[in-house]
Amino acid sequence: MSTFIGQLIGFAVIVFIIMKWVAPLVKSMMQKQQEAIRAALEESAEASKKLAEADAMHTKAVEDAKSEGQKVTDEARQDSERITAQLAEQADTEAERIKSQGAQQVQLMRQQLIRQLRSGLGAESVEKAEEIVRNYVSDPAAQASTVDRFLEELNAMAPSPAVLEAGATLNLRAASREALAELVKKFESVADGADSDTLTTVADELSGVAKVLLSETTLNKHLAEPTDDSTAKTRLVERLFDGKLGSNSLELLKTATAQRWSSEGNLIDALEHVARLALLARAERDGQSEEVEDQLFRFGRLLDSQSQLSRLLADTTVPTDKRVELLKKVVDSAGEVNGTVAALLTQTVELLRGEPADAAVSDLAELAVARRGEAVAEVTAAADLSEEQRTRLTEILSRIYGTPVSVQLDVDPDVLGGLLITVGDEVIDGSISSRLAAARTGLPD
């Protein structure tokens, strides 16, 4: 019995120990294990849910991929069809362009070939024609016949509407033209009955005054300034030039300064013009007008052919005395030169103010002819004209221009035949050389 009780107590102690310490520990461990299992189950459920969602998303992604792939395929097919159509259209357009360019190129090559053939044949034709013409005009009689034919053509021309002017009036405005006319009128009254020495004095003195005004620009400005009352300018002229100029020159200078000039330089132009008229009037008194006219034209043609000489004579950077010295050397080398011509040329060179020397001498020659009431016709021919041809040409030109015409002939074999005529600003070109040149110019490039 005691054994049983001892065992029962031992069992009770064991149960107490188990319940006191072991059971809570086991219970805690079991709860933890249950929590772990529960968490594992929840995680498993969540994982299953996520897996299901992933499967759904995968399925949807696959469907979307299929749909997008189909869309891309459709778009690619459409792009392919569009590109194919565009390439076909571009190919057609390019083919048409190439075809058109090819046709244009063929046409261009055809035209170039035709032009080359025409140019070659045309040049050969012109050269052959020139050879034939040169052979023809080598005969003086045949060359003269070309002049006669041109005179027949010229005879049929209508009268020219050109107004021929010469000398200083060419570059003047209306006011200065009227002023110059008054001054020339005064000169004519002074020159009427004057002898050669008086005219020479007037020419020298007026030329000297012009040179003074060129160097004294302030004085020139004052004397040329337009005023309603010229009394002050007249008194100034008397105070400066009385006793230094002859009575005729002084009266002419007073008349000049009393006029209204368009510009200051026109007063000098007018004095130079009247000084020239005085020398030309002297030539008339001495019966040398035609000789003076002829020598002036010859010197003008010399300057035309010697451009360097013309530039040297007109170079205002060179002192005037040096240019006059050069002129005298040229005049002396030309042989016997009329004294009036030498004086006119010297006066012209001394008063050059920027214009070319050849143009100034040409104006001087035209003034010499205009002084005799004639127009000047500068005629270029391949050979000298016969007296009959010269007379007929003079008659025809006088009838065309309605005024007596003086013919100045220049012989140039390069003209070949016919005539080249210049009257004032009008040119009548009937030379064979110009016709050949026109034919050569008209050839295609």
Swiss-Prot record:
Q: Which keywords accompany this UniProt record? A: ATP synthesis, Cell membrane, CF(0), Hydrogen ion transport, Ion transport, Membrane, Multifunctional enzyme, Transmembrane, Transmembrane helix, Transport
| UniProt cross-references to Pfam families, sorted A to Z | ATP-synt_B (PF00430), OSCP (PF00213)
UniProt region (ATP synthase subunit b), positions on chain: 1-168
The way this protein sits in the membrane is described as: Single-pass membrane protein
Family annotation (InterPro entries) = ATP_synth_B-like_membr_sf, ATP_synth_b/b'su_bac/chlpt, ATP_synth_OSCP/delta_N_sf, ATPase_OSCP/dsu
Annotated Gene Ontology cellular component terms:
plasma membrane; proton-transporting ATP synthase complex
Entry's transmembrane regions: 4-24
Keyword set includes Membrane: yes
Is Transmembrane given among the entry's keywords?
yes
Q: Single GO molecular-function term?
A: proton-transporting ATP synthase activity, rotational mechanism
**Residues annotated as region ATP synthase subunit delta?**
169-445
Annotated stretches, region: Disordered: 50-79
Instruction: Specify where it is mainly localized.
Output: membrane
The record's subcellular locations are: Cell membrane
What the protein does comes down to: F(1)F(0) ATP synthase produces ATP from ADP in the presence of a proton or sodium gradient. F-type ATPases consist of two structural domains, F(1) containing the extramembraneous catalytic core and F(0) containing the membrane proton channel, linked together by a central stalk and a peripheral stalk. During catalysis, ATP synthesis in the catalytic domain of F(1) is coupled via a rotary mechanism of the central stalk subunits to proton translocation.
Relate the assembly described in the record.
Answer: F-type ATPases have 2 components, F(1) - the catalytic core - and F(0) - the membrane proton channel. F(1) has five subunits: alpha(3), beta(3), gamma(1), delta(1), epsilon(1). F(0) has three main subunits: a(1), b(2) and c(10-14). The alpha and beta chains form an alternating ring which encloses part of the gamma chain. F(1) is attached to F(0) by a central stalk formed by the gamma and epsilon chains, while a peripheral stalk is formed by the delta and b chains.
What protein family does this chain belong to?
In the N-terminal section; belongs to the ATPase B chain family. In the C-terminal section; belongs to the ATPase delta chain family.
Tell me what this protein is called: ATP synthase subunit b-delta
Lineage, highest ranks first = Bacteria, Bacillati, Actinomycetota, Actinomycetes, Mycobacteriales
